[in-house]
């Protein structure tokens, strides 16, 4: 059953982006025009209602290229946000757990707030309320030594590597008595 004159081409499925200007299509031997784009309708209504001077300006407007509608899902905003958040997360150092021998609780500190080993030692002394915490370079003078767990789950002395490398690899801090810190390269008196 062929139904002529019902304008079924409006609901016809086609491949292509919305707003593409298709040439005339033929349905059952008759030639009809495809649905018009909004810009075409605006210029044709302007031609009907305006005088001769405005017709000349609208013809000049038609010579400009027609802007096609933006494709759905472009630009890929979600992947941009995901990538940006991953970059920010990698820049942010974050909090690490700190435990001390003889203290029944653990604390967390933000390594990003410290800018050197000296500043880190000061923060830890204030946090646990004790003096005499030191890093590897001043190990003989201190009662306590700070060790840290790196990405490879190895325990190392704080102060053996440059500060930036320490911030990137530190997962956990532990404050131990100097006498208990054997196997870390400290020389006993």
Curated annotation (Swiss-Prot):
Identify the gene encoding this protein: IAA6
Q: Pfam families this protein is in?
A: AUX_IAA (PF02309)
Q: What is this protein called?
A: Auxin-responsive protein IAA6
Q: Is the Kinase keyword given for this protein?
A: no
Q: Where is this motif: EAR-like (transcriptional repression)?
A: 13-17
Signal peptide position in this chain? none
Keywords from the UniProt entry: Auxin signaling pathway, Nucleus, Repressor, Transcription, Transcription regulation
Q: How does it assemble?
A: Homodimers and heterodimers. Interacts with TPL.
Q: Which InterPro entries match?
A: AUX/IAA_dom, AUX_IAA, PB1-like
